[in-house]
Amino acid sequence: MMKRILLGLLCASMSLCAVAQNRVTKVLIPGARGLLAAEVQMPENKGTGKCPITILAHGFGGDKNWQLMKLVSDSLQMHGIASIRFDFNGHGESEGDFKDMTVPNEIEDLKRVVRYALQLDGCNGKIGLLGHSQGGVVVSMTEMNDTISAVTLLAPAAVLREDAIRGNTFGVLYNPINPPEYVELPGGRKLGREYILTAFRLPIYETAIRYQGAAFLIHGTGDRVAPYSYSERYKNIWKNSELHLMEEYDHGFSRHIEEIADLASNFLIKHLL
């Protein structure tokens, strides 16, 4: 009997995985610096077939295949919400050179993905945004009109502006007033001069305050990349927001991705359905 139960659970799990895989479409979306590689994950059609869509924005040096974001997409799909995971320019499978990436051109990338989502036949016009680290900053600075119904920021790295002002990014020192053509980061990636110059002057919170819809912030108190005080500042300017401080969790929530994915998904489901 126990073997039959386990076999049944295994088959059910495999069926869910098969449904998820069959409803994922790889697409290319024109971005600020070339084509953006993206994956559109749709739920099973119900009723009119129209559903909300959440767009997920990865962090600095990351990509759309980060396990936490895939977990969020799968959870949303099972609750009738579509998602788009994409690589910013110069990242993952997208076109562009990492050296030419800046926060402003990532904002433009995200705007174009939002426009793409709104044109999809299956979209009902309600959009959710989720961003991690620098992706969280990009989400917070992207123009959000009435179509944006919910925003989730995971460890938003608004510290990037102060890093540029100090001339210290990931421990690499440079002259912030007159930076070189590029600085080489640990791991070999090259951070371009334009990134530094634009980060130096980013009006992060001055822009983010324009959004006053539902927002959810998750930040680890053990984050050594972007201190949680940056999320506290978002909480102060967004009156309709919740802040969850996770005791001793790191910047990537490395040992807790399932928990963070559940928290983020539940918030988006609540506000998009």
For the regions a language model picked out, list residue spans one by one:
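Short beta-strand/loop motif that positions the catalytic acidic residue
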Residues: 211-212, 217-219, 223
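Conserved alpha/beta-hydrolase
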Residues: 73-95
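Conserved alpha/beta-hydrolase "acid-adjacent" motif
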Residues: 224-230
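N-terminal cap/lid segment of alpha/beta-hydrolase-fold proteins
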Residues: 21-47
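Hydrolase active-site cap/lid region
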Residues: 146-193
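The serine-hydrolase catalytic nucleophile loop
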Residues: 61-73, 88, 229
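Catalytic nucleophile-loop/oxyanion-hole region of alpha/beta-hydrolase
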Residues: 29, 64-65, 91-123
